[in-house]
């Protein structure tokens, strides 16, 4: 079954299909919250399956409001380590907050017409106040990490920094040759088409059209994912199997079950603690012996 991973060391399902029937890809749905619905462990399984099956392309379908920055960074690191063996293509519907990371870690980004990307500012929970606050040091480190990820994919690092750090201005202008320059530095005097991309009043979010105009990815054509093969040097590519969806769903299910087990443990521990405290209060000198039967 091509939707299930072959055993380690065993011949992959449909081995050789990519070489005889043209290029193939695996589709990885990244829908929902990073760290809950979208987990790095699922992507690890998909990459391993792709390598064993001879699949060279992985398409990340991103439609996420964000989530845990730590899980997003782990996803980015996994992609970085595999990018010489697998080509990642981001198909973006919405990539906000931590969901920006898998997009900028891909070799290419393509946007649906109504897509958006950005707003990657991170907050930390402060138990003393019960509020979420911006941690400037963490943001600075995260911005540097994400900018490096973007630049390794040929994207502009200043755009990413503006998505992470509030109050960071970004400008754009055109050269005499028609190239678009995007920078945190002010445009030179007389620069052509000079404009402010982000006015430093908040974190940057780009529409699909804005991102395309700034060379921060490309717009998807009417053919959608099926039509992207021509643009990523895999003409006529086809979906190899549904294993990508299977793996991501399985990883999320495992985490949910683990969380339920932790919740049950905490509930039992709380109940036992209350019973012990009651027993101690009613028998402070420990005269009553307690026996437990298996």
Predicted segment positions?
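Charged, glycine-interspersed solvent-exposed loop segments at helix/strand-loop junctions
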Residues: 126-257
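A short, well-ordered alpha-helical element
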Residues: 36-56
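Charged, amphipathic alpha-helical linkers/stalks
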Residues: 230-292
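STAS-typified acidic loop motif
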Residues: 19-41
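Soluble non-cytosolic domains of exported or imported proteins
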Residues: 33-41, 66-73, 94-97, 111, ...
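Terminal peptide-recognition signature
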Residues: 28, 43, 60, 103, ...
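Compositionally biased, proline/threonine/alanine/serine-rich low-complexity intrinsically disordered stretches
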Residues: 1-24
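Glycine-rich beta-to-alpha active-site loop
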Residues: 64-75, 79-127, 134-138, 142-145, ...
